[in-house]
Amino acid sequence: TALAGCSNHEGESTAPKSELNVMSYNIRYANASDKGDAAWDARKEASVTMIHDVKPDVIGMQEPRFSQAQYLIGELTEYEHYYLAPDDKDSQHRNAVWWRKDRFEMLAQGYFFLNEKDITQPIKGWGHNQFRTALWVKLRERSTGKEFFFFNTHLAHRASPVEGGDIDQVARTESVKLIVEQMKQIAGRYAPIFVTGDMNASYAAGDGRRTCLDGFFEFMWSARETAPDGEADDVYSYN
């Protein structure tokens, strides 16, 4: 999922628009139990080929383990990256942002945890069984001097109903609210902002899970809806 905007209300910039090719990519963490075509060793060359073919300007990536990140660093030499590894385990709770180093320079970076207690600590939020994170970078386009913020996240997924509702839906909804609050504090209300992520929520109209993204849609525009015709699709693939 990719969303973008300054704000969904007043304050829209009148500056000339620049094109930005953005990719959100859950790479599927390298799991020893994945066999055959699902194994990372079977997928890694195709992953690099796909990125080289699509040529995204910025990538929001979810789940790259250390070994995967090291491989990609060696192969994606045209990109710089910010790789978030907030624990000392080689877990799937790792996110990254990649950007074309010939086009952009990074001005700032940071991250926070998605929970209701202390966003500086790896606390499991809203009764969930895993901690989740969001990371961000501030980039400047070298040719124009334009600056923007890019956030990337991976929202809750467990599919465990609890009394009073789905704990996943609660965690996703509250996480989105928190991310939007942090966007406003870090970037301000009218700075250009992009957010990508594995939202673990359906985009389909009428699907109740979509409501957890309301906080994003109230603050931003959907890049899917504003993309040129034919450049956004609903094709599923295996990482």
Task: Give residue ranges: language-model regions.
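N-terminal, active-site-proximal structural segment of metallo-dependent hydrolase catalytic domains
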Residues: 3-75, 87-93, 177
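Loop/turn elements at helix/coil->beta-strand transitions in domains of secreted/extracellular proteins
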Residues: 17-21, 54-58, 77-81, 144-149, ...
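Acidic/histidine-rich helix-loop elements
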Residues: 24-45, 114-129, 156-171
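Active-site environment of divalent metal-dependent phosphoester hydrolases
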Residues: 29-31, 64-69, 157-161, 200-210, ...
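Sec-exported extracytoplasmic/periplasmic mature domains
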Residues: 52-56, 69, 73-78, 103, ...
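Structured beta-strand-rich core segments of catalytic domains in phosphoester-bond hydrolases
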Residues: 58-155
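Active site of divalent-metal-dependent phosphoester/diester hydrolases
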Residues: 81-100, 116-119, 125-131, 190-193, ...
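His/acidic metal-ligating clusters that form di-metal
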Residues: 133-153, 165-209
